[in-house]
């Protein structure tokens, strides 16, 4: 399977440097230029999609609908498995305030936010979903609209990077990640949009033999299935 993964449009809360998580927010004034950029880059490369997936948060669903229309797809599939990390009661708090009062913020992937979840838990559910999708749809090319935290989790897991080191890594609203799978294993990673900084020397090829043998770095936490997020909601647009 080939998964093209991008981020949702920019919101007013994103622009205000506040915590968003599972909440939602109106679009920022410059949102359309970012979304147009992503669609244009994919169209220039002649990418065709079999399906479109997103989190079930409004900013991701609306971005997915925009792209789906551009590519002639009438249904999007949304799932909470792709949701941003749940910051619980920290919703709409200033990020600077959170960093001062919670020193674990974007430093400890196992810290559970009050009434929310940890980055590790978010990574586990989202990676479980993507791995299952790749295994069951080996011949498809899919578009996935997700969130910065989810994207960091994907890259850290599939490239074998230390998750804690990348929790503060900036992900542009013009990011386009190109993940190619053999079964559940990601064997190739590229970036087609604004560079994220994760890749410094172009395309990363991960030989299947190396993945199977475990000769590349792997995350410290095992990825578990997430049955509570196993169902998808299909929406006609």
Locate each region found by the language model.
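Phosphate-handling substructures
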Residues: 13, 21, 25-26, 68-127, ...
């Amino acid at each position: 399977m080939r998964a093209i993964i991008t981020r949702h449009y920019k919101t007013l809360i994103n622009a205000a440097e506040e915590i968003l998580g599972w909440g939602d927010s109106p679009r920022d004034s410059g949102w359309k230029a970012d979304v147009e950029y992503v669609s244009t880059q994919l169209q220039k490369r002649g990418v065709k999609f079999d399906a479109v997936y997103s989190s079930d948060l409004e900013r991701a669903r609306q971005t997915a609908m925009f792209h789906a229309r551009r590519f002639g797809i009438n249904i999007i599939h949304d799932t909470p498995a792709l949701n941003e990390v749940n910051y619980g009661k920290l919703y709409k708090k200033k990020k600077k305030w959170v960093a001062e009062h919670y020193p674990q913020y974007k430093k400890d992937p196992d810290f559970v936010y009050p009434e929310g979840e940890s980055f590790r838990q978010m990574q586990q559910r989202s990676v479980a979903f993507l791995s299952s999708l790749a295994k069951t749809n080996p011949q498809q090319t899919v578009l996935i609209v997700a969130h910065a935290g989810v994207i960091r989790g994907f890259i850290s897991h599939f490239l074998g990077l230390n998750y804690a080191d990348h929790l503060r890594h900036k992900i542009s609203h013009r990011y386009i990640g190109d993940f190619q799978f053999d079964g559940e294993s990601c064997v190739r990673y590229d970036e087609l949009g604004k560079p994220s900084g994760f890749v410094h020397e172009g395309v990363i090829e991960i030989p299947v033999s190396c993945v199977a043998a475990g000769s590349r770095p792997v995350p410290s936490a095992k990825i578990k299935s997430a049955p509570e997020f196993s169902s998808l909601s299909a929406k006609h647009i």
